[in-house]
């Protein structure tokens, strides 16, 4: 049997972030083979991962990347249980690697099974993180924007490391004019989407989710009816309020945060003159970390009781 040295144990710990005794046992079980021991730890971690799968993963990172030619951009959200993990170098590196892979594999379903540039399957990469870091994790979502002529701009807010943050926005501008102008304005619009008090729900009114429109109409109808106005006037009130709401949540109709006297639509018209050709917003993507994920509220008393009964 190969000698299990302290240096070998240390190397395996650095490679996997597993505990010292676990690393020693893994090396003993695999005759000192470092790679086999790492795989053994991962296999051991698989059973742990299953136990963690029901724990809410609402923290983590949003990773963003734009291709070298500036015509494609991607955002991914990699979740974990605590914000502490977001500062882990291995976690940040994994998020960046997944984002790079997502530039090629757009659909989330195919991304899970895709291989990174290093040859590791994305699902295996995430499972390995669960095993070594010890928290439930998941690749929650991924979205890519691409233009044939134009530029895709990226803005990351509350940055946690290179290419990773708590909020990310992509904006795609279509146009054959001055690309430097498109890139600059695209980034400014991305900053607008990140910072405006009312995050846009759609690019145009026609792109709004019919369910969201129906819900808003129901709310405004109820409010108008309770006002005691005649039905005809109430109906006009509803239509007026729906139009106002659409102006608030449609990107092109929103006042530009850097110049509230100008709408995004007017900014695009101005940009076309600067760029020397027609410009249009092809699309935008906004990922805010953990949005829509129900976070588990810890019951401290129950936790103490559980620890007491277990001791």
Curated annotation (Swiss-Prot):
Keywords assigned by UniProt, alphabetized: Cytoplasm, Elongation factor, Protein biosynthesis
Any one GO CC term of the record: cytoplasm
GO molecular function annotation: translation elongation factor activity
Keyword Endoplasmic reticulum part of the UniProt annotation: no
Pfam families, per database record: EF_TS (PF00889)
Annotated localization: Cytoplasm
InterPro entries associated with the record: EF-Ts_dimer_sf, Transl_elong_EFTs/EF1B, Transl_elong_EFTs/EF1B_dimer, Transl_elong_Ts_CS, UBA-like_sf
Region (Involved in Mg(2+) ion dislocation from EF-Tu): 82-85
Gene3D superfamilies (UniProt xref): 1.10.286.20, DNA helicase RuvA subunit, C-terminal domain, Elongation factor Ts, dimerisation domain
Biological function: Associates with the EF-Tu.GDP complex and induces the exchange of GDP to GTP. It remains bound to the aminoacyl-tRNA.EF-Tu.GTP complex up to the GTP hydrolysis stage on the ribosome.
Family: Belongs to the EF-Ts family.
Listed name of the protein: Elongation factor Ts
Protein's gene: tsf
């Amino acid at each position: 049997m190969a000698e299990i040295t302290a240096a070998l144990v240390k190397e395996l710990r650095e490679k996997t972030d597993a505990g010292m005794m676990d690393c020693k046992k893994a090396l003993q079980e695999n005759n000192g083979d470092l790679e086999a021991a790492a795989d053994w730890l991962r296999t051991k971690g698989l059973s742990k991962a299953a136990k963690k799968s029901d724990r809410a993963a609402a923290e983590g990172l949003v990773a963003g990347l734009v291709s070298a030619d500036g015509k494609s951009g991607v955002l991914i959200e990699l979740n974990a249980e605590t914000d502490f993990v977001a500062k882990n170098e291995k976690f940040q590196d994994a998020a960046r690697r997944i984002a790079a892979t997502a530039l090629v594999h757009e659909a989330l379903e195919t991304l899970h099974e895709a291989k990174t540039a290093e040859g590791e399957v994305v699902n295996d990469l995430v499972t390995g993180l669960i095993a070594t870091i010890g928290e439930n994790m998941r690749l929650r979502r991924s979205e890519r924007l691409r233009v044939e002529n134009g530029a895709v701009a990226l803005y990351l807010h509350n940055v946690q490391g290179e290419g990773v943050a708590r909020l990310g926005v992509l904006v795609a501008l279509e146009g054959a004019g001055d690309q430097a102008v498109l890139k600059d304005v695209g980034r400014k619009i991305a900053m607008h989407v990140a910072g405006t008090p009312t995050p846009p729900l759609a690019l145009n009114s026609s792109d709004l989710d019919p369910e969201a429109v129906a819900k808003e109409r129901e709310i405004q109808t109820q409010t108008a009816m309770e006002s005691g106005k005649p039905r005809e006037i109430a109906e006009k009130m509803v239509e007026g309020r729906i139009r106002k709401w659409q102006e608030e949540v449609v990107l092109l109709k929103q006042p530009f945060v850097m110049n509230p006297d100008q709408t995004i639509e007017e900014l695009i018209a101005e940009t076309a003159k600067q760029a020397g050709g027609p410009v249009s917003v092809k699309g935008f993507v906004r990922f805010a970390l953990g949005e829509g994920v129900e976070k588990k509220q810890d019951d401290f008393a129950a936790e103490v009781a559980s620890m007491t009964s277990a001791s």
